[in-house]
């Protein structure tokens, strides 16, 4: 009996089958793109850095149902995949697999290819042996490794089909490296990914590390998006002068194109780095003060514009940071919890399906 139980738990890979991820339910995209694993076709006005970030798959997901006991992926990188750095390898070039249990998304497995060179297929197992029967699955893609092609690997002869949309509505989240996910240990641990799983609403990652500065071309692009709401992490990157100059034109551009669509701005977070660095503390405080001043004016002037000031990624123990500026995965959980109630209260006023 012991031997039989051991054999039942071993990896089941023998013969395999490969399903193009594009034939399943692909979600998390705000814009249609020429290349499927990019978030937006690069805009002419973008800097070279922003054009590179536009090609990242952060926030993209694949939903599918399968009765396979083993599940993996086969990926071809579009460019040399990063080793990790601030992200860690699972967040940078890995994949997070979730499955539904008792109506909630639960982590099921993850992994990342050791190989980083582009142009060759690399295969990894995410879960070698899971429960019998049909599983509702959600696969989160790498945050910063550019993907050329992706296939879901399952047992040969198993059934795999597109899954239902995992979350309702379409809510664009434009922001900084915090929104992109810098410092997260896994690709499913950005604050907006956690907010989606916690609420059932579809918060879509449009983070541009270091480059969320209320640029007019981002406003023009977002104004064309087919969305039910916007959330903006808009004050983590720009200087107070940029906020004062750019905020109202940014709002006006989107409001003109999307009247009646809620625009929710959230305050930036405090950084642990400020604890022993007075100059850095003054820098962050000046940003927050200008953001608060301007947003109080904007919420009075424009309908359906909201200001959420409860954002926090600081733990009671001050142990939720990856580098003094960016939260770690736990810090992003705290961020999500800090804004969940006010954001959902605002969204409850609107019909989001």
Predicted segments with their positions:
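Catalytic His-Asp segment of secreted/periplasmic serine-dependent ester chemistry enzymes
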Residues: 223, 271-353
């Amino acid at each position: 009996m012991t031997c039989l139980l051991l054999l039942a738990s071993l990896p089941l890979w023998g013969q395999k089958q490969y399903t193009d991820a594009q034939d399943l339910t692909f979600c998390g995209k705000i814009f249609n793109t020429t290349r499927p694993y990019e978030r937006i076709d690069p805009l002419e006005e973008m800097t070279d850095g922003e054009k590179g970030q536009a090609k990242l798959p952060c926030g993209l997901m694949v939903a599918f149902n399968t009765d396979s006991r083993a599940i993996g992926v086969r990926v071809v990188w579009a460019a040399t995949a990063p080793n990790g750095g601030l992200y860690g390898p699972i967040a940078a070039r890995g994949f997070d697999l979730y499955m539904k249990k008792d109506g909630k998304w639960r982590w099921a497995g993850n992994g990342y290819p050791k190989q980083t060179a582009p142009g060759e297929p690399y295969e990894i197992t995410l879960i070698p042996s899971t429960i019998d029967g049909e599983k509702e699955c959600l696969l989160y893609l790498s945050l910063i490794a550019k993907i050329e092609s992706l296939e879901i690997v399952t047992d040969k002869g198993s059934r795999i089909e597109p899954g239902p949309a995992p979350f309702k509505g379409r809510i664009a989240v434009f922001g900084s490296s915090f929104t992109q996910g810098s410092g997260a240990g896994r690709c499913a641990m950005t604050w907006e990914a956690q907010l989606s799983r916690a609420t059932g609403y579809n918060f879509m990652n449009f983070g541009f590390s270091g480059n969320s500065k209320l640029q007019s071309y981002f406003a023009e692009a977002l104004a064309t998006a087919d969305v039910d709401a916007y959330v903006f992490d808009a004050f983590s990157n720009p200087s107070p002068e940029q906020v004062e100059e750019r905020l109202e034109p940014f709002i006006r551009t989107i409001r003109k194109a999307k009247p009646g669509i809620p625009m929710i701005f959230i305050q930036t977070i405090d950084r642990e780095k400020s604890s022993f660095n007075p100059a850095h503390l003054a820098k962050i405080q000046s940003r927050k003060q200008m953001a608060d001043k301007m947003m109080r004016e904007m919420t009075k002037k424009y309908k359906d514009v909201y200001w959420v000031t409860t954002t926090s990624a600081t733990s009671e123990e001050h142990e939720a940071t990856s580098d003094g500026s960016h939260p770690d995965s736990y810090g992003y959980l705290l961020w999500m919890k800090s804004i969940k109630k006010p954001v959902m209260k605002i969204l409850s006023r609107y019909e989001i399906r």
